[in-house]
Each structure stands twice: as structure tokens, then as C-alpha cells.
Amino acid sequence: MAEARDLFKEFKVQSVSEFFRRNAAMLGYTGSIRSLTTVIHEAVTNSLDACEEAGILPYVRVEIEELGKEHYKVIVEDNGPGIPEDYIPHVFGKMLAGTKAHRNIQSRGQQGIGISGAVMFAQITSGKATRVITSTGDDEIVEAWVKIDVQKNEGKIVKKIKHPNPKRWRGTRIELEVKNVKYVRSKQGVYWYLKLTAIANPHAHIELVEPDGKLIVFPRSSEDIPEPPVEMKPHPKGVMTDDVYTMAHRSKRSTVRRFLVSEFSRISDKKVDELVLYIAALRLINREVTDQNLKSQLIERLANGEVEKVLKSFGRKWKKVVEEVEKIMEKPPEKLTWHEAEEIVEAFKLMKFLAPPTYGLRPIGEENIEKGLSSILRPEFVTAVTRPPKVYSGGIPFQVEVGIAYGGEITNSEILRYANRVPLLFDAGSCVITSAVRSIDWRRYRVESFDNAPLVVLVNVVSVHVPYTSTGKQSIASIDEIYNEIRLALMEAARRLAAYLGGKYRRLYQIRRKKIFEKYLPEIARSLHILTGEPEEKIKEYFLRLIESKITVAQEGVSEVEVEEGEA
Amino acid sequence: MKLKRGKPKEKFSYDPQKVLKKLEDLAYKILEEVKAGKNPYFDVPTRGLSNVYFDEEARLIKLGDKLSRRYFLNVAHARKFMQTLILMAYVKRLVSEGKHASLREAYYANKHTIPGTHENTFEDQSESDPIIEDLERMLGVLREEMHITADRRGYVYGDIVIKDGEDEFNASKLGMGGWAVPGTVEHIQFPEINVDYVLVVETAAMADRLIEEKYPKRERALIIATQGQASRGVRRLIHRLHYEEGLPIIVFTDGDPYGWYIYSTIKQGSINLAYLSEKLATPDAKFVGMTMDDIKEYGLEHVTEKLKGIPPDKKGGPTGDYKRLIEELNYPWFQNKEWQRQLKLALKWGVRIEQQALANKSLEFVAKEYLPEKIREGKLLP
């Protein structure tokens, strides 16, 4: 156990900035197209989050200028709350310093690297500092050039100018110069990323100026600013050793017991007593039992709740071990060792807890999904379903929502994947969203072939811990609970689509019918005129009146009495 | 047996006004329905075998009473509804102007692009022909009465006076070719008839033979050559000569399933034109030959030919002549011992005998011995 501690110390010593340099790929900075998208993503996410927290309807403008081959300047400007001067190095310079790191909160941010990662990427590809222009709306505008001190994991302002702010401009504009990136209008590119972001954030006005000067606007379609997510205490089933260790060391509680009770959900004093027994039992098993079969038998009994019986099976010494463990609970949390944290998590896995609360989840909402899809894709039909929150792996709350947009300006089929509103652009094949959408028999919903239909399916998986398949965080793992929820949501939305298509086809059919009848009128009128002498115009009028009265092209459907069709 | 002209059972009935009235009545019905806000329709007697039956008493193939309604407000019917009205209007013009048009002319005269569309009123003659048939069935009038003529085929030779419009002539004084039967015979009248019966002959070659042998004059017969399957004009002419002029009808065809089918059509009508049987068919017609018995009787065994197709007891059979023979065996109007015998013999022997085979005896044999003998002795099939 001492080993583990040393290892971790070593890890801590290593600068996170250096870690970034070595693991740029893992953080989304891989490939020239994706790297650019990641830079934009970090900046836009920052803007949206800041606006959300400040209760501002976001306006985000992204400009991309081509400076040379694989060499671009990226400008992202928002109308957010602005950054106070003192915080600039902190926000843009320090990694893992974001307000959300180590908080159990649903977030757009991916790795806690955030915008500082983009600053870092700019710095290591172009060598240039990031230019930040910001104001909180007071009488001055701060213009600062920020770099990251890779050794100290600190941001530093290399140059700073202050300007007067007579018009009380408020917001933040950042300019990054990046190399080894490429602007392409592909499904992995910036355009697509912003389009998808706009769909999932209908309250945001997003603009993009492409390298060739073309301006693309994704206008705001909703005036509702989403409520900022609420921090939820983590559920014991949803934490790993690292979480417990880090949380304990940050905790200001007096004892480990108090720390556990107050910083986790569903842990009471009684549960801590139970935890002590479990840890003691695990210690005894690990210490005394060498036979693997017996070991797993005993652990199984623990999982079945027979902790006291298991303890007693070790004879009188069990009480001593329990006393040992109880001592852990009474020491200050910052003294908790990595190994002890590991023991706690091990015990959590075997214990039973109430399901976690779900109040902290922030779905986009049915109405806003519909608005987003309508305004960006201009479909003729749109519907959305937000499922009630569910739990996966016994302790992690999640929620699924889907949107379906059909027809109109949509020309082909598309699956738009989101995790916590963030578009997932890569690794579609391994994503549970893709497999769930594919598993639907779309023909049952009047969609002849999914691949050829003008049909866009949006799926957003909301969770404090979205189970990604890999560190790239671009695809969601196939967890049964999530898969089933996506399917249920899709089927509900698809049923509405089917009902719409039914009505639509009926209406189209009626219009077509009417046209058929009307087009024959001149011939019929002429002939009947020859046969009966009635004026042609009058005959036409009679027939038109008949058609109008018998065929109603209305939302409600058909009023026509369909006659039996004989042999013709 | 001496054949004699009998008493007429029907009167010359051609009246253009009747056709016009029927057309207008139907058009007014449509107009009134539309005015009343009702979906207008035509009741069209159903075509096809399913709506055909054999009337034992009248001895005719008749059209059943199945109707199909052709509505205007029905996507599947609307076009035909329009086409029906177009052709009704066209027929009205033809009849009132006293002009005649062929089926093809009727098609071309009414084919045009519907204003404001890229659609033609008729795409093909196969669209207009059935509508004209529908009109015949709906109105109960012949196409010919609507001044739309069919293909003309067949000719007449014999001592009768024919009045065709302005022209009057004797059908035995037009040369050996006789008088070609027009598409429409409705308006034809017969001011003078100096024959005792009508001999309907399948092949032109045989008719020519008989004319050359002066058979019509000697036997007081009117020869009608059908030249294969009898055209509507010929069938209508036969019908009228029998029912309006009282002339007995005797049919003379090849001794094979096709020849017998020609007879069957003249006598009972056809399935396709079942709705016209009462005007086209002549159930009183009799059959003189050729028969299977003729082969033995006149020693023609060596001039028979094999039936075409595969016999029923061979693999893939029956086809061709055999197939038609078996069908004819099942015809209600062939359910008598005479016909069953002929058909079964043909099936058994697998042979056919042509009219021209009689030339094996001598050229004049058919005119001087075969026909006069058989007719005199009443060796006729029903």
C-alpha cells in the first residue's frame, strides 16, 4: 500500500501541463481536423457555461482565419459575464482548475482541461500566446496575452493592456493561433460541430465566419436559459478510489465518518457502521484466506449481506479488526490513505444503497429540442421525448432524450449524438446511441428505409458520469440500461412520426386526388356540353362544387365516402 | 328436305334517333347527379367470362347482370369516366351528321392533350376500343348503330337486291366477287329476295368454287363468305337475314375445331360479345359440314390432316387443336349427341378435314353432290 501512495505522489508531482503535452491525443487533440474542432469546442463550451451560470442568453461568434498551410487564427467571442482581471491567468492557464473539476456535476466540459487545453495547444503548435479581451461590463476592457508555464502548471500574462470601456461592453473574446489543424466542412469539422451545438442549445445564438469569409448564423430559437446544473453528492456506487481520495483530501470535515456522511448521497451514520464491518471482513478475507474458491465464496456472502456471519467465521479476532477500521473513520479525512480509499470503494461495491437522487440532471427538454431542430434543420415535422431519469450500474443517474425531425429541408438521414448536450462527432460506430437507433425497425413507423429517409434522429444522454467507451470521450458504452432507455424514447417519438406521416400521406393523397379530378374537368365539361347543351362553364362549376364538397383536404382527415370500386 | 324462306320474326329496326336519345338520357342523368351534389357514375355491365351465361331457352350466350359502377370521384375511374363522356359526345356527332368512323378513326379523332396537362385523352387505341364496347353494353346498342364500324370482312353473292343508302343493286350481278359486306349493315335493306336459304361458307376459296359452279343460282342460295371468323358485320347480316327476312341459315366450315368454333360463334354468339348475342347470333343456324362422319361417308381418309398440338394423353397436352376440342366438348350448346360424336371422333382419330379436301373427288363434287345431297337429305347438325 505504501507503493500505491508513492506512485500517486509521483503522479501529483508530474505537471499536468506536461501530462497534456504527452497525452494531447487523449484530450481530443488528434488529427488536424479534430484538433481544430476541439479548440472550438473548449472555447464555445466555456462561453455557454459562463452565460448559463450568469443567466445570460448567449451570443457566440466564431471566426476562423487561414494564415497559412494548416495554420489558422481562431477567434471566439461571447456576451458572457466577462472575466475579472485577476482570474485571467487562472481561467486560461491552469489545467484542472476549472470550476467543475472534482465536482459531481453534470457538465459540458470533458476532461477538466477545458480552455486551458486550447491555450496549451496553441502554444505548442504555433508558439504564440493566446490573446484575451474581456470586460465584466465595467469601465475598462482588459486585453491580455496568456501563456502557460508548463513546468509550474500556471498561466501567466505575458502582456497586458487596459482600454476604456465607454459603451460598457461585456463579454470575452479570445484569439488563438494554431498550427497543424485544418478547416474542412466535414462531419467532424467545426461547421458541423457548431450546427449540432446550436441544435442542442436553442437558447444560444451562434455565428461562424469560415476562412473564406462566409458567415453562417444559427439563430436563437428559445428564450429560456437552462438552469445551471446542481451539484449532486456522489453516490457510493458511482465513485472510484481516486474520487474518494481526492474528495477526502479536499474535505473540511473533522473525521472520515463525517466526510462520508455529508459528502456522499445515501450514506448515513448507520451505513458507516456497516461500512466498517465490510472493510474489516474484507481485510480478514484478504489476510487469512489463501484459497481463491473460498475467498470468492466469502465475498459472495458479503454481497448477500451476511457480513456479521462472515466476520464471526474468523473467530474472536474479528472484533480487533473492526476496532482497527473504526479508527480510520475517526481520523481527519486528509489523513485518509490511497489504500484506505481503495478499501472503502471495494466495500461500497458489496454494500446496498438507496438509488441516487436525480434532481441534478439537466436535460435539454422536449420543447427546446423541438425548437433547436426546427430552427436549424427546418423540417416539416419535429417531436422530442425526454425520459424520466434512470440509474445505471446501481448508482449512477442518467436520463435520455431524443428528438426526431423529418422532411422539409432535411434531405438524408442523420444520427446526432450528444452527451450532456455536447455533440459527439467521432467513433459513431461503437456508440450505444448508434446501435440503439439502428435497432429500431423504422418500417414499423412508416419510414421505409432509415438510410434513405429525410430523417434526423437526435439522442442526448445526460449523466453526471457518462460511460464513455474510451478516453477520447466520443462514444458512449453499451450499457443495457442506457440502450433500453434510448430505444424506449425512440419508439415513443417514432410513434408520433408514424402518426404524422399517416396524416401527411392522407393529405397529400387527397390533394393529388383533387388534382386528378380537376384536370379532367375541361374535357368532361366540353363533352357534356355537346351531349346536353348545358353551358361548359356551368358544368365545370357543378363539378368543382362536387369535388369541393366530397374531398376535404383538412387536418382531421377525409370526409369523403369512399365508394366501392368495381371492376374497371 | 326443301329449305324455304320462313316468316320474319324481327323488323328492320335501324333508327338513329333512338341512339341519340339513349346518349342524351345518359348524359342528363350524369348532369343531374352532379347538380344534386352526388358522385356521378356509369353502370357498365361487367365484361369477361364471369358475367356470361348460356341461356338454354334462347340458346344464346348472354351477358349476366353484373354491373360495375364507374364513378367520377374515384381515382381509378376518373379517367375512364372522362373518356366515356368524350366518346359519347363523339358518337352523338357521328350519328347526327350521318357519318361513320372506324375504331381507329374514333381513336385519332378524340386523341389530344388535355388542356393544362401533359396527359392525352387517349394514349392508345387499346384505351378507346374498350370504352366503345362499354358504351354498347351500357346503351344496349351496337357499335355499328353508333356509326363506328368494325373491320370489314366477308362478301355476299346471290339473287337478292340490296339497298345501301342511295344505291340499289342485285348481289348476283356484281361479278364473281359479289358484294363486300361493309362494317355496318344496320342501314342495309333488302327490297327483293329470290333465294331460299343462306349458305355461310368459311373460306373464300370454297365460296368462289361454289359461285363458279353456279351453285347459288341452281340451289337458290345466298352465299356468304366469312373469310375466317365471321366479322360483326357478317354476323349481324346473317342475323338480320334470318330474323328479318326469314331465311334459313346453313353453315359450311372446315372439319376442325376452328371451323366448328366459327359455327358456334354465328349460332350462339361469343363470350367477348355476349352482350350483343341477341343482335348478332342466330341460334336457328344449322351445320352442314365438314364433319368427321364425312370422312368415312365420302372416303376422304387419305386427304385428312393431323390435328395440331399435343393430345391430352401426351406429356404437356392438351394444346392447340386438342385443347380447343376439349373446350368445345364442354360447351353447353354442343351438349347433344351429334356434336359430342363429331368432337369425340376428332379427338379419337386426331385428324381434321378441310372443305377443299372435297376437291379430291372433283372440282364440282362439292357443288353438285356433297352440299345438295346433304341439304336435301337433311344431314345437318343442330
Swiss-Prot record, chain A:
Instruction: Answer whether the UniProt record assigns the keyword Nucleotide-binding to this protein.
Output: yes
* Molecular function terms from GO: ATP binding; DNA binding; DNA topoisomerase type II (double strand cut, ATP-hydrolyzing) activity
Q: Which GO BP terms, alphabetically? A: DNA topological change
Its EC number(s): 5.6.2.2
Organism superkingdom: Archaea
Ordered alphabetically, the record's keywords are: ATP-binding, DNA-binding, Isomerase, Nucleotide-binding, Topoisomerase
**What job does this protein perform?**
Relaxes both positive and negative superturns and exhibits a strong decatenase activity.
Q: How does it assemble?
A: Homodimer. Heterotetramer of two Top6A and two Top6B chains.
What this protein is called in its record is Type 2 DNA topoisomerase 6 subunit B
Organism in which the protein naturally occurs: Pyrococcus furiosus (strain ATCC 43587 / DSM 3638 / JCM 8422 / Vc1)
Q: What is the lineage of its organism?
A: Archaea, Methanobacteriati, Methanobacteriota, Thermococci, Thermococcales
What gene does the UniProt entry assign to this protein?
Answer: top6B
From Swiss-Prot, chain B:
Q: What is its EC number?
A: 5.6.2.2
Q: Kindly give the Gene3D superfamilies that the UniProt entry links to this protein.
A: 3.40.1360.10, Winged helix-like DNA-binding domain superfamily/Winged helix DNA-binding domain (1.10.10.10)
Needed cofactors: Mg(2+)
* InterPro entries named in the record: Spo11/TopoVI_A, Spo11/TopoVI_A_N, Spo11/TopoVI_A_sf, Topo_VI_alpha, TopoVI_A, TOPRIM_Topo6A/Spo11, WH-like_DNA-bd_sf
Domain Topo IIA-type catalytic, residue spans: 14-155
The molecular function terms of the Gene Ontology recorded here are:
ATP binding; DNA binding; DNA topoisomerase type II (double strand cut, ATP-hydrolyzing) activity; magnesium ion binding
Return the broad EC class. isomerase
Q: Tell me the first and last residues of the signal peptide.
A: none
UniProt entry keywords in alphabetical sequence:
ATP-binding, DNA-binding, Isomerase, Magnesium, Metal-binding, Nucleotide-binding, Topoisomerase
The subunit structure is:
Homodimer. Heterotetramer of two Top6A and two Top6B chains.
Instruction: Tell me the protein's name.
Output: Type 2 DNA topoisomerase 6 subunit A
Source lineage? Archaea, Methanobacteriati, Methanobacteriota, Thermococci, Thermococcales
